[in-house]
Each structure stands twice: as structure tokens, then as C-alpha cells.
Amino acid sequence: VEELGNEVFLLAHLRYFGLYFSPLNVYFVKKNERCTHMLAEVSNTPWREKHYYALDLYDLKQHPKEFHVSPFNPMEQTYQWIINPPNNYESPCVIHIESFSQKTSDKVFDATLRLRRKPLNNSALTRTLLRTPMQTLTVMMGIYWQALKLLLKRVPFYKHPSKL
């Protein structure tokens, strides 16, 4: 990591009341006061597996999907990341990902996380806990709620590649 940068910052969910789940943890590597690289730790909910995507923030190229995240998305996809890293407190951190079908080149998925950087201290942590006391459960319930809606719409279901 030293040749890439001299500081690492983690963007992740907090553990609430002993419960922890985070579909995406992001490690930003900073060199000379600028974020230069990002390590995205992706978790898939039903299988409790993790995969890592290492990204050069100055050379974000499309790359093949390497990890089965959702049973509603096939593996034959390509990812494109658009990142505005948290270089300072003034500009927002934006993590945007799009996935495209390798067969048709159509966009099949799009997600954006837009956050403002804030200091980590006791008062900020207390405010966060009081404002969102059940964040872990909310995230997990949201994922399963969306999955149920997709099932009811009869969206195709793709088995885990290692389970075939």
C-alpha cells in the first residue's frame, strides 16, 4: 500500500446492537492529500461471500463482473465505476456503478451512493445512532423487500455459479 499512498480511509456501515451487515465497504487510498485508489469490498447477501475490486481512480476502465452478487443479475455483465472520492469536506463523495449486458451492451443496473464527509467523534456517532438506530436491519430488510418484489414480477432467477 505504501507505494500507492500513505493513508487509508474506510467507508462502511456501523455495527448496531451487535448486528453488522454492509453490502459494500470502500477503502480509499490517499497519496499527497488526494485519493488515488479504491478497494471495493462487495458482499452478497444470500451466500455471505465477499469479493474485492481494486480500482485506480485515475484510470477507471470497464471490467467484467467477477462476483455473483444477486440472483436477479447474471454473471455475463461488465461494470463501469464513476467515482468522486472524499478528498475534502466540501465536495460530496460519489460512488456510481453501472452494469451492462455483455450480450447486448444494454445497461441493466445502476446504483449511486452520494455522501458528505463528516468528522468522526462521539457527538456525531451518537447523532447517527439516534437518527438511524436500526440501520443494519433496515438495509437487510430493504434488500429482501426488493428481492420479493422482483420475484413477484417473475424476473429471471440466476443460480450461483458455484451451485450449478
Predicted regions and their residues:
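Mature, function-bearing regions of proteins
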Residues: V1-L164
